[in-house]
Amino acid sequence: MRKYELLYIIRPSVDEEAKKALIERFNNVITENGGTVEKTTDMGKRRFAYEINKMREGHYVLLNIVAEPKAILETERLMKISDDVVRQMTTKDER
């Protein structure tokens, strides 16, 4: 198993309950595929450096994950399908 950092941005128009449900949903996808979420950090609403899809800000969420690559691929696939996720990026944690 490898360590990963997954950062994703949720649309600013999503209310607090829906945001929590979305975070929980993606955490469950990782655990259902044999991974573990070590830490979930809600970084709050932040302004973008440039406009993305006519939006100027979004809710940033950072996940520290230990998982197999298949769990990461499935999570990324679901994030790309979701209209509530503006952007996502996964990096291998080398620490």
Swiss-Prot record:
GO BP term, example: translation
CDD domains per record: bS6
Keyword annotations from UniProtKB, A to Z: Ribonucleoprotein, Ribosomal protein, RNA-binding, rRNA-binding
Superkingdom of origin: Bacteria
UniProt GO MF annotations: small ribosomal subunit rRNA binding; structural constituent of ribosome
One GO CC annotation: cytoplasm
Keyword Ribonucleoprotein on entry: yes
DNA damage in keyword set: no
Record InterPro entries: Ribosomal_bS6 (IPR000529), Ribosomal_bS6_sf (IPR035980), Ribosomal_S6_plastid/chlpt (IPR020814), Transl_elong_EF1B/ribsomal_bS6 (IPR014717)
Family: Belongs to the bacterial ribosomal protein bS6 family.
HAMAP family: Ribosomal_bS6 (MF_00360)
Function: Binds together with bS18 to 16S ribosomal RNA.
Protein name per the record: Small ribosomal subunit protein bS6
Encoding gene (name): rpsF
